[in-house]
Amino acid sequence: MNTHWFITLIALCCPAMTLAAPNETAVVAPVDAISFLKQHDAKVQAILAEATADTLPPALRENIKGHINAAFDFPELSRLALGTHWQERTPEDRDHFIQTFSGIIEEQNFDSFVQYYREGKITYESAERDGDATVVVAKVPLQREEIEIVYKLHQVQKAWRVYDLVIDGVSTAEGNRRRYARYIEKKGYEKLIAQLDKQLARLRPTRN
């Protein structure tokens, strides 16, 4: 398993229609975030164990997608990806971007996620609070090397959600923000979302 998909994935979650805000209730211990990640991994692996062949039947595939998606806060990831341009968008624009952005990540990275859950051996090493977020450091052995993954999580409606992944020091949220900012500066937001819509349309027929 190579590391390329780790760098490009942000993660998968159900396309949300509104921007979810971090939970404002009681403080939760950082160690609970590790428990959440471990339980999430175990659930997906249990579903994968039901497969009798390498090719997943459609119903099982959708079940796995749902569980993988549930770990991530795509509205927040979308906000971070657009950076300052997020405030310039209407609520309808934001909803559109969330749906398209999440769909692209889901379609591009599903097979790599499945490979990871089948073969990956991740060790969650530590968790600590960083402002309103909780940062979990993990290590994944890949062939002869080991990569570090830093999960950034917060509470959304009393549930842990991942909103950024830092892979060997590279933040996926920051990478997307820089890339989209350059595109918007050159061609404008409307051309960006049109290009993303086309990309998603190309991806979906190959997956369904």
Model-found features: residue ranges?
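Low-complexity, intrinsically disordered terminal/linker segments enriched in charged
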Residues: 167-208
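Bacterial N-terminal signal peptides that target proteins for export
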Residues: 1-7
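Surface-exposed, charged secondary-structure patches
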Residues: 107-147, 199-208
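Surface-exposed, polar/charged faces of alpha-helical domains
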Residues: 28-31, 35, 46, 50-53, ...
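Early exported N-terminus immediately downstream of N-terminal targeting peptides
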Residues: 26-109
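N-terminal signal peptide c-region/cleavage motif recognized by signal peptidases
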Residues: 13-16, 21
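Solvent-exposed loop/turn segments at secondary-structure junctions
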Residues: 86, 103-104, 143, 169-172
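Short beta-strand edge/turn micro-motifs at domain boundaries
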Residues: 146-174
